[in-house]
């Protein structure tokens, strides 16, 4: 019962879509209506509003971090922490508050990993930053980071059957699966680079008072 309750609370925390909330509060178009139609920081950046993108990134990462941190702080067993990690991540992917139309989970996963262990989170985030800096593809950076996250986990903590390690692996698999469309675009050379502004985003910003 304790695990179920903790997972439910974590899922509800994860269901808060900061991309939609921040965009609405700042008078911007709904990120689900332009660009990749993904409610995440990268797509919000396509609106041209960097502040909104940063707030989205921080908010999505924070909810992943706070859910796992609270589980640890309350002294829940590792199996409960593992379910909390997965639940907050699933909440972001399929938010009950937004008709289950969520993001791809990169920032939320980063927050979860930082709470699991700061070195694990920082190593994974650094991997994302390096790939993003050199190739300018957010999706490629996310995919590479997702592949390396379980590797970093094994390197740091060994190959024991800790349930949190399985949660990290599950999140990595889900994150790659959520990027399957991006993989096709990358292979076809049609993927948008970081900083690209979609025409739809510009139109959406104009409709909302030119705040893009």
From Swiss-Prot:
EC numbers, comma separated: 2.3.1.275
GO MF annotation terms: acyl-phosphate glycerol-3-phosphate acyltransferase activity
SMART domains: G3P_acyltransf
Transmembrane region(s): 3-23, 78-98, 115-135, 155-177
Protein name as it appears in the record: Glycerol-3-phosphate acyltransferase
Enzyme class: transferase
Localization (cell): Cell inner membrane
GO biological process, one term: phospholipid biosynthetic process
